[in-house]
Regions:
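C-terminal motif of bacterial Sec signal peptides marking the signal peptidase cleavage site
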Residues: 5-6
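Blade/loop signatures of beta-propeller domains
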Residues: 12-53
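Blade-loop segments of beta-propeller domains
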Residues: 54-63, 83, 92-119, 126
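Short coil/turn segments at the loop-to-beta-strand junctions that recur within blades
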Residues: 57, 98-105, 146-153, 199-204, ...
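Repeated scaffold domains used in trafficking and secretory/extracellular systems
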Residues: 63-66, 108-113, 150-158, 205-212, ...
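Short beta-strand elements that form the blades of beta-propeller/WD-repeat-like
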Residues: 72-78, 120-126, 162-176, 215-231, ...
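Asp-box/WD-like beta-propeller blade repeats and closely related beta-sheet repeat scaffolds
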Residues: 108-110, 125-175, 196-200
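Conserved blade-ending motifs and adjacent loop-strand segments that build the rim/top face
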Residues: 242-265, 301-329
Length: 380
């Protein structure tokens, strides 16, 4: 199994280039491949970081709506209080971004919050179909305006460059019903969509993915979760492409001899797919099976699986809800809530031999009033 330890070369337009001279490999014995690998049993303990967000009266976090890693720190959207925070990687609050309310320059109900690396801004999509751009260094508002068709709510968005975006929606606040045809578009600045893709009635179903699409090599890869297909849109020409990448009967990225449970997931039409992401050489797929998070890495050169790993967080009967986060394929992180951690610690106190990850959990100081804990793996 190839484990990447922050090997990406940071160059404009080449964020996913991999420097294999700096890559780290972990040898896996053949007998270990007979079953799924447990990530916390093979990772180097030094490559795992656990951050506890320091809390005070100004930043008591509630339910995490979104968590994004940026060069400046960890961006947190609190869906309970509608607040947006920027923490450093030591868990210290740097600043709040914008403010919630009905006044000038305030956002009312954020639908999505994301970081735009092309202009170093935090961008908020509001229920009022407005977009607001805040400077990540100062938190000051840099832009406010209507960027989308007013009758459509953009529920998820990704920047393609400083003012070109891909967006997805399936709800019309004007008609107050879900549309028969979901809408996916590429748009620029204050203009309405340059290019739209409509799905016929048979495939127009709610997308269960956390991220229904991602950007790679200046193209938008759209993943539709019932009939697994990927749509490509070239961000330069805005000419849509369509090609079938995953097949329900015989997934093209799955080795026919690989007993991976991802075949089961495809047979179930991917009801709980979480993430699809891509680098120059690999495709990462994260999904749920039997309430356990799993991810599979596929080699793009021969379309064969490099193995399936299991997030070993469901410790026996404990039901932990975790949120996996991919950022450019370079790491995987999770958010764990205090009540879950306390149950884990209670269980771990009865376990004699702890895995490296379990040992780190066991040493955490946590109470019912603690902020959530962010876990970062620097191994992908």
């Amino acid at each position: 199994m190839l484990i990447l330890t922050g090997c990406n070369i940071k160059e404009p337009r080449k964020k996913n280039n991999i420097d294999f001279k700096k890559a780290k490999t972990i040898p896996i014995e053949d007998k270990q491949l007979a079953d799924h690998l447990f990530l916390d049993q093979i990772i180097d303990t030094q490559s795992l970081e656990i951050y506890t967000f320091k809390e005070d009266k100004d930043n008591m976090l509630g339910m995490i709506g979104k968590c994004v890693s940026t060069p400046e720190g960890i961006l947190i959207f609190d869906s309970s209080t509608k607040a947006i925070y920027l923490f450093d990687f030591n868990g210290n609050l740097i600043r709040k971004i914008g403010s919630y309310g009905k006044g000038p320059h305030e956002y009312l109900k954020p639908l999505d919050v994301f970081y735009n690396p092309f202009n170093n801004t935090v961008e908020v999509l509001d229920m009022a179909v407005k977009t607001r751009k805040f400077d990540i260094h100062s938190g000051e508002l840099k832009f406010e305006g209507y960027s989308f068709q007013r009758k459509y709510h953009i529920a998820f968005s990704l920047p393609l460059d400083s003012n070109l975006y891909a967006g997805y929606n399936g709800f019309s606040p004007v008609e107050e019903v879900y549309q028969n045809n979901f809408r996916f578009g590429v748009f620029k600045g204050k203009n309405i969509a340059y290019r739209n893709l409509y799905f016929d009635k048979e495939t127009a179903v709610p997308v269960t993915s956390i991220n229904p699409f991602y950007v790679f090599n200046n193209k938008v890869h759209f993943f539709e979760s019932i009939f697994p297909v990927i749509y490509n849109i070239d961000a330069d020409s805005l000419v849509p492409e369509y090609h079938l990448v995953f097949k329900t009967a015989n997934p093209s990225f799955t080795d026919p001899d690989d007993p991976s449970l991802i075949k089961e997931v495809f047979d179930k039409k991917l009801p709980m797919l979480n993430r699809v992401n891509e680098t120059n050489n690999f495709i990462f797929i994260t999904y749920l099976v039997d309430e356990m998070k799993r991810f599979t890495i596929y080699n793009k050169a021969d379309s064969k699986s490099l193995g399936t790993a299991v997030f070993n967080y469901k410790i026996k009967e404990l039901d932990l809800e975790l949120y996996s986060l991919f950022q450019d394929g370079t790491f995987l992180g999770s958010i764990v809530y205090p009540d879950d951690l306390m149950r884990v610690k209670e269980h771990l106190s009865k376990v004699q031999n702890l895995s490296p990850l379990q040992d780190r959990f066991n040493k955490l100081t946590v109470s019912a009033l603690s902020n959530p804990v962010f876990i970062r793996f620097k191994t992908i």
